[in-house]
Amino acid sequence: TAAGRGVESSDVFVECALKLLTDEGVLAFVLPEALLDVHNHKTIREIIAESANVSRVSFLGDAFYGVQCPSLVLQLEKSSDPGHSKGAVIERDGREFVVGTDRPLGSENFMLRLTDDEYRLLCRIENTDNCEFLRGQADFALGIVTGDNAKYVSTECGEGMEAVITGADVYRYRCGKTEKYMYPELTLYQQAAPLELYRAPEKLIYRFINRQLVFAYDDRQRLTLNSCNVVIPHIPGLDMRYIMAILNSRVAQYIYEKRYNAVKVLRSHIENIPVPVADEETQRRIISKAEELMAEELITESSVNSEMQTYKTGKDHLQRYRLYEEIDDIVRKLYSVTDEEYEFIKQSLSGDKYML
């Protein structure tokens, strides 16, 4: 039953309505879009999957004035053969399509936002051969929750303070120059992970609240605030910088965006991204390019009076883009993504395509 502590009232209405229907009976409700994949709605998804099929979904966006809650119209048909979505009509962003490839309705999510082409490619990528996962092979840590940032976080580095990384400082492959400082005594704060996780010889830092996967490398044992979290991979034979490149790739972003449609990067999202097992030479090729992106300043060359002069610049965006594209092309081939599929991925992703 969907009733219980912390219950969503919309879930109770759906459950009661399904009980009143006979087979082939139809119901339609305006519901929060979160019903499709947010954990709080897991029980009602189970109930729907065990008693009905989806026949139509109309995505409404933020339909109610002054309320930030994307909504949808969900039409269900009670069935003795429940748990299917084949034949469902989907209306979204001014277009309409029919689900031709059945997507079994599961308790974790209802994959009803995607076209058949998007869904098939997602499933193929997720089932790439010879992959490892971070589930059970990584340490995770949340950033520090001070309980009072105005009191504990400063824009000036006072005596005994040290730099702390915030989500705004994190870009793909690198952390920008931070302008926040705090005391390293973790007992001062409301919530913090064990100090040894922040002080690990190397770790990955990622933006927590973001529609994109943005991972940076840190080997300076820096603290992080709760707008960015920490993951320390331990997959045998795979370099941490290589894993960072995988997580920063368009293929990983495609999985995250299409599978979860989330605004917060959760541990479970990261753990479920397949990481191809690459040979040492391939890892070296990727890491050598990644290390250039990790630098706060890039080394470029220009011709001055017919002589080659080396200089530093932190503004050479074109060079960063080129390096990202070179890495990304190697990564997508590890997933056996064809040229046509790769172009499809590029066209279907939203948001800033680089975040460098």
Language model region names:
Residues T1-K151, L223-C228, P236-M240, V263-I270:
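Signature of N6-adenine DNA methyltransferases within the class I
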Residues A3-V7, Y183, T313:
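Short, flexible loop segments at the rims of nucleotide/cofactor-binding pockets, characterized by
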Residues D11, L18-L21, E118-R285:
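Polybasic, glycine- and aromatic-enriched phosphate-binding surface used to engage nucleic acids
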Residues L21, G25, L35-V38, S51-R56, ...:
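A generic secondary-structure signal for well-formed alpha-helical elements
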Residues V30, L60, E77, R207-I209, ...:
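Generic beta-strand/beta-sheet core signal
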Residues I48-E50, T166, N248, K346:
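Alpha-helix boundary recognition
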Residues D102-N149, M161, G167-V170, V277-L356:
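Non-catalytic DNA-recognition/assembly elements of restriction-modification systems
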